[in-house]
């Protein structure tokens, strides 16, 4: 992709559209739990919380009705990237809240991350809270907050929480589907 991107003379959104980026989200299956755990352990730059959950804690969350979780798979005209993301939403508060969001650097800067968060804001009635804990390495995750113009909502010793409102005008670069 990098060579083709370097040769592209149009704007980046047009280039990304030409890549035919596809993303599929679904509830994690038993055989995907280990990959979800691996993403939580290995992902630094695109990790919203910085948390390192044990595999037992991941299983516990997946069975808890207060949470909804998604795995993210992606492909484009250059290939199939497999399972590249994992996201946990706490549905128990005043608004659904993304507590953890990790995505592989293999698909960074393809607009998948903000497309997914914007989609979920719409799915949950137009608004979604997003927990973010700044670490030494996850600045790229904060860029998503800025790209979606999330507004500061609350702050604690643990997280900064942002309000994400669905933006119907967000570019349709990624073909995102839910299974």
Task: Please identify what each model-predicted range represents.
Residues 28-96:
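A conserved beta-strand-loop-helix scaffold within acyl/acetyltransferase catalytic domains
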Residues 25-29, 47-50, 109, 130, ...:
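Generic alpha-helical structural element
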Residues 1, 6-23, 27-45, 78, ...:
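Conserved helicase motor core of SF1/SF2 NTP-dependent helicases
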Residues 1-21, 122, 126-179:
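Terminal substrate-recognition subdomain of acyl/acetyltransferases
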Residues 60-63, 108-110, 154, 163-167:
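Low-complexity, flexible helical/coil segments
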Residues 18, 40-43, 71, 98-102, ...:
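Generic, low-specificity signal for short hydrophobic/alpha-helical stretches with a mild N-terminal bias
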């Amino acid at each position: 992709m990098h060579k083709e991107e370097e040769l592209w003379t149009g704007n980046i959104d047009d280039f990304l559209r030409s890549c035919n980026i596809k993303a599929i989200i679904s509830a994690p299956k038993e055989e995907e739990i280990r990959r979800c755990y691996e993403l939580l352990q290995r992902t630094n730059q695109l990790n919203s919380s910085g948390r390192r959950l044990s595999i037992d804690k991941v299983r516990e969350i997946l069975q808890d009705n207060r949470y909804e979780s998604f795995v993210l798979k992606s492909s484009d005209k250059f290939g199939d990237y497999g399972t590249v993301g994992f996201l946990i939403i706490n549905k128990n508060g005043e608004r659904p809240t993304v507590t953890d969001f990790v995505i592989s650097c293999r698909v960074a800067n393809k607009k998948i991350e903000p497309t997914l968060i914007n989609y979920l804001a719409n799915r949950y009635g137009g608004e979604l809270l997003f927990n973010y804990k700044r670490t030494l390495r996850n600045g790229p995750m904060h860029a998503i907050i800025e790209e979606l113009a999330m507004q500061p909502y609350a702050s604690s010793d643990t997280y900064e929480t942002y309000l994400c409102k669905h933006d119907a005008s967000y570019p349709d670069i990624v073909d995102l589907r839910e299974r």
